[in-house]
Regions:
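Short intrinsically disordered, low-complexity coil segments enriched in acidic
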Residues: 1-6, 30, 112, 117
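Gly/Ser/Thr-rich phosphate-binding loop
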Residues: 2-3, 13-78, 82, 91
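Structural motif
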Residues: 5-7, 33, 212-214
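Alpha-helix capping/helix-boundary segments
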Residues: 7-9, 36, 118
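The DHp (HisKA) dimerization/phosphotransfer helix of two-component histidine kinases
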Residues: 8-11, 131
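Short catalytic/ligand-binding loop motif for oxyanion handling, primarily in non-cytosolic enzymes
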Residues: 10-12, 38-40, 62-65, 205-207, ...
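AMP-dependent adenylate-forming
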Residues: 52-55, 70-264
Length: 264
C-alpha cells in the first residue's frame, strides 16, 4: 500500500518515472491532503491498472479520515475527482449559504462533519474553536456538535462530493463569486503543464496563474485556461516558472508565491 499526497504522485508522472521502473507489487494507492489532478491519476492507472485507487478526505480537526472515494470509473484529464461519501461512524453534508442541506445536483455548500471523533478544539484558542465547532443548525431538537471545515464542494449526479476550494480561496470580483481552485484546476489540466497555482492580488484586483511546464508561450496557457472557465474567471496574467515551490508537507507553497508575485 502506498499513501501519499497528490503532489508526490504528480512528481512521478511529471518525470515519466514508470518508463524506467514500475512498482508492480503495489496493490493499493491512497492519496489525501490536497486535490488530486485527474491527469496524474490517469498516468498511474495507465501503468498500474490493477491497483485500487482511493481519494481520502479528513481534516486534522476530525482526527481521522471522514470520507473516501474508491475510483470505479474512467475520468477525462479535465474532470474533477470525487471525494466520495462518509465513512462509518460519521456523517458529512454540504451546508449552503442559506443554511440548508444541499441535496440537488450541482448545489454547492461548505463541507460539514459530525461524529464521535471530532477534536475538542484548538489549544488556547477558544474563539477559533467556537467559530468552527458549532451546534448543528439543522438540528434544533438536541445538542449536536459539528465541525465546519471551511472547504467548499458541490454534489454531482451520483450524490458524491466534488471538491471546489477553501472558503478563504474564494474571492468576489466585479460582483461575481470566483473560486480560485476552479481556475487552478483548469490550468493544471492542460497537457504539458506539470503544476499550476491560481493567486489573487488584492492590491491590484488581478488573478494570476503561476505554472511549471514545458509550454513556453504563456498566452497559450492563458487561452486554454480561459476556454475552460466562465469569462469572468479568466486570469489576467499567466507566469511560467522553472520549478514550483513546495512546503514541508509536499504541498504547493502558496505563501511564497504570494510574497514573490503579489507582494503579500
Amino acid at each position: 500500500t502506498l499513501y501519499w499526497v497528490p503532489s508526490a504522485l504528480a512528481i512521478v508522472s511529471n518525470w515519466n518515472v514508470f518508463d524506467f521502473a514500475r512498482p508492480e507489487h503495489l496493490q493499493k494507492i491512497l492519496f489525501a491532503g490536497e486535490v488530486m489532478p485527474v491527469k496524474h491519476l490517469n498516468y498511474w492507472r495507465r501503468y498500474l491498472p490493477d491497483c485500487l485507487y482511493a481519494n481520502l478526505f479528513g481534516p486534522t480537526e476530525t482526527t481521522d479520515i471522514c470520507s473516501f472515494y474508491v475510483v470505479d470509473r474512467n475520468f477525462a484529464d479535465s474532470d474533477s475527482l470525487p471525494i466520495g461519501r462518509a465513512c462509518n461512524n460519521c456523517d458529512t453534508f454540504l451546508l449552503t449559504e442559506e443554511g440548508t442541506r444541499a441535496s440537488r445536483t450541482g448545489e454547492e455548500g461548505e463541507i460539514v462533519v459530525r461524529g464521535s471523533f471530532l477534536a475538542d478544539g484548538y489549544y488556547n484558542e477558544p474563539e477559533k474553536t467556537a467559530a468552527v465547532f458549532t451546534q448543528n443548525p439543522l438540528n434544533t431538537a438536541f445538542p449536536e456538535r459539528i465541525y465546519r471545515t471551511g472547504d467548499l464542494a458541490r454534489l454531482n449526479e451520483k450524490g458524491e462530493f466534488i471538491y471546489i476550494s477553501r472558503k478563504d480561496f474564494q474571492i468576489k470580483r466585479m460582483g461575481y463569486r470566483i473560486e480560485l481552485g476552479e481556475i487552478e484546476a483548469a490550468a493544471g489540466s492542460i497537457e504539458k503543464v506539470k503544476s499550476a497555482a491560481a493567486l489573487y492580488d488584492a492590491d491590484t484586483g488581478r488573478i494570476l496563474v503561476i505554472y511549471e511546464g514545458s509550454i513556453k508561450d504563456t498566452d497559450e496557457v492563458l487561452q486554454q485556461t480561459a476556454d475552460k472557465v466562465p469569462p469572468y474567471m479568466r486570469p489576467d496574467e499567466v507566469i511560467r516558472i522553472k520549478q514550483m515551490p513546495y512546503n514541508a508537507n509536499g504541498k504547493i507553497d502558496r505563501q511564497r508565491l504570494l510574497k514573490e508575485y503579489c507582494g503579500a
